[in-house]
Amino acid sequence: MGYVLKRKKMALMVFGVMTIGFLSLVIPAIYFEMNGNPAIAELGITQEMGSMEGKEVRFGSAASAYWAINTTCTSNGSVNAMHDSMTPLTGLFAMLGMMVNSFYGGVGVGFINFYVFIILAVFIGGLMVGRTPEFLGKKVEAKEVKIAMIIALIHPLMILGGTALTSFLYSGSPEIYASWLKNPSHHGFSEFLYEFSSASANNGSGFEGLGDNTPFWNITTGLVMLICRYLPIIGPVAIAGMLASKKYIPESAGTLKTDTSTFGILILAVIGIVAALAFFPALTLGPLAEYFVMSGM
């Protein structure tokens, strides 16, 4: 991006924001996995190598947690350990990687999701400081922001809507859908949430305690994949077309600079508010609740 646009400083800012976001997920994930599983510790079993359930000895807990975040942040989907067996908070950070769906871009689409958050940050930043929202010398107006906001909201809508539907069906008739869950309660909810997060984020990994090879799961996750893999491509391309048709405006004292660390912090804030906080209630019911129950709090 820096070479094509001849804006190396902006490219470094984008890379820095992505790196900070990635590290904020991978560091705690490795920490919690290396600390072991509280439920196993209560049995008097030593966990010098960390939580090793569902992991290969050659990788260990640290490398397994590291790759879990790598594969969920980049829509990779390959795994070197069973994500379903990871400690609750490591599973939470893996889910957040797919829920944010922006750090380092995705397979086949690059950083197209991050581009949406840049547009939103430009508009919000311009309004906050009273400057004209501009990006790469082109005015960012209502049409572009509406498209960006719709694209940003489709992702949580599909994940939370799908999770809500499956939770409603399971709670209403658990005997009919008993094959879905081997681990009901908080972890079962996490399995629902992870499945739709993976489908929506173009990932492919899963909490494999979920019995998901059924017509219901294949159809619902297929619809989520169809919606969340094509619309997020169409929207940013439409925004790019609108900006390309506008007259170039030279930078002035009233232009919000998009290559500074301040703007990078603003992008992180927008990602945190629009993407991460939208999922906080669901994460509270799933992995967070499981962690507190497992820890005896």
Mark where each language-model region is.
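C-terminal structured "cap/appendage" subdomains that terminate the fold
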Residues: 217, 222-270
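Selective recognition of specific alpha-helical transmembrane segments in multi-pass small-molecule
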Residues: 2-36, 108-113, 145-167, 228, ...
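C-terminal catalytic subdomain
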Residues: 116-120, 125, 129, 147-187, ...
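In a subset of proteins, long, contiguous C-terminal domains/tails are tracked
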Residues: 252-297
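Alpha-helical transmembrane segments
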Residues: 2-5, 127-141, 238-259
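Interfacial and helix-entry/exit segments of alpha-helical transmembrane bundles
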Residues: 49-52, 138-156, 177-188, 255-270
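P-loop potassium selectivity filter motif centered on the GYG triad
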Residues: 39-109, 175-227, 282-297
